[in-house]
Design a protein with these regions (language model features):
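Autoinhibitory propeptides
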Residues: 1-13, 35-98, 102, 386
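Short glycine-/aliphatic-rich beta-strand segments at the starts of folded cytosolic domains
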Residues: 12-30
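Subtilisin-like serine protease catalytic core
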Residues: 103-113, 119-134, 144-194, 214, ...
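Gly/Ser-rich catalytic serine loop of serine hydrolases
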Residues: 143-154, 336-346
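C-terminal subdomain of the subtilisin-like protease fold in secreted/lumenal serine endopeptidases
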Residues: 213-217, 357-397
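Extracellular S/T/G-rich loop segment that most often corresponds to the catalytic His/Ser-adjacent loop
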Residues: 265-353
Length: 397
């Protein structure tokens, strides 16, 4: 194994040398022969969890001896630990909820937004006057019907396409007539495996034509700087762009100091949204990760992200029992407030739905250019805000 250690992530290599665990959940990158590799994994009596053919990856739970054996195969290029990503928005109690409002004729009608999050609760604002949850897939607990045991995904869905029916339009989404395809890849604690997220991304891209998905909203952060993992995300982002999609991510929740931005937020083929506090006089949100990163403006722009009001979820509700669909209980309080850069990512996702409704032929570069030229700089350093905040009057027809 020592002669082949260049195929191993250094952290995994250390764990193996130290005999830390009996099993390891890993991502295996193959340059070819993925099916034969999976057959070999099965013959070693190990479990295969995911196969993401778009990026030639397999996720499996392997023993140390199985890892040793697999390293001998020339088609296997690299093996790394399957780490976690984290949602970056927190529920807070506040009497000063900020709502996202747009007063334009565009509503995102017919435009699909793919979301990888903690799920979506069947909230009235997403079901009335029509059901905006076009598809729900659960990669955590494998349930068949919408639910959200964390609340984050429901909140983001409301920011994008909530109808506002429970608040007489006060807390409607930015693109209220758009629809969502929600994949639950994050558990009730707001953690999700990288492999599940990659598989979710591939699923949304592959089914984008069926649901007219134009935007993929990824309201989470990856805190590591693993070049291999980032290369997998970058390949999938490129695939999304080739199909006319745009990927939106938050800048993350590190302190708003120079060079604090990490993970997928640094990639050039996605739109990265930071956050600012708009509750009083504008100021940068304390936990909005900042650039610069290489020669890029990251984040690309910022959006309000403090005390934002949107949909609440009954996190105790489970949508099925023994294969039978269960219906959600009545909830008295329909809305709550969150703070975090994921709110900004959801807002920009909704704005992009409006842009696609107006012109279905836009590509990633078009969207990024439109957002950039329609933004105003605030009185912050550029590494905190990129191009600044969106001026909707300049952006929307």
């Amino acid at each position: 194994m020592f002669s082949l250690k260049h195929k191993l992530d250094p952290t995994l290599n250390h764990a193996l040398l130290s005999n830390l665990y009996e099993n390891y959940r890993v991502i295996i990158y193959c340059k070819s022969l993925e099916i034969k590799t999976m057959d070999k994994i099965k013959s070693l009596k190990c479990d295969i969890l995911r196969h993401v053919p778009s990026v030639n990856c397999i996720c499996a739970i392997l023993t140390p001896s199985a890892i040793d054996r697999l390293l001998e195969y020339p088609q296997i290029v690299y093996i790394t630990l399957d780490s976690y990503a984290h949602l970056c928005g927190n529920s807070i109690l506040s009497s000063n909820g900020v709502s996202f409002q747009t007063n334009y004729d565009l509503t995102g009608k017919g435009i699909g937004v793919g979301i990888v999050d903690s799920g979506v609760y069947p909230h009235g604002d997403l079901l009335n006057p029509s059901n905006s949850i076009k598809k729900f897939v659960d990669f955590v607990n494998n349930l068949n019907y919408p639910y959200d045991d964390n609340g984050h995904g429901t909140f983001m869905s409301g920011l994008i396409c909530g109808s506002g029916s429970g608040s007489k339009g006060m807390y409607k989404g930015v693109a209220k007539n758009s629809h969502i395809y929600m994949i639950k890849a994050f558990d009730k604690l707001g953690k999700g495996f990288i492999s599940d997220i990659l598989f979710s991304l591939e699923t949304l891209i592959n089914e984008s034509c069926d649901f007219n998905i134009k935007i993929i909203c990824l309201p989470f952060e990856t805190l590591e700087t693993d070049e291999f993992v980032l290369s997998l995300f970058s390949k999938l982002f490129d695939l999304a762009i080739s199909k006319g999609l745009v990927v939106i991510v938050p800048s993350g929740s590190n302190k708003s100091i120079k060079n604090s931005i990490r993970g997928i937020a640094t990639l050039s083929n996605c739109i990265t949204v930071g956050g600012y506090d708009s509750t009083f006089s504008p100021k940068i949100y304390e936990y909005s990760s900042c650039g610069p990163f290489k020669k890029q403006d990251k984040p690309n722009l910022i959006s309000a992200c403090v005390d934002i009001c949107s949909l609440i979820s009954d996190t105790k509700f489970i949508s099925e029992k023994n294969g039978v669909k269960l219906y959600p209980p009545h909830i008295t309080n329909l809305y709550t407030t969150y703070t975090g850069t994921s709110c900004g990512a959801a807002f920009i996702s909704g704005i992009c739905a409006l842009l696609y409704e107006n012109n279905k032929n836009l590509c990633f570069k078009d969207i990024l250019a439109l957002l950039k030229v329609s933004s105003n700089l605030l009185n912050f350093p550029k590494y905190m805000q990129g191009s600044g905040i969106i001026n909707l009057e300049r952006l929307l027809p």
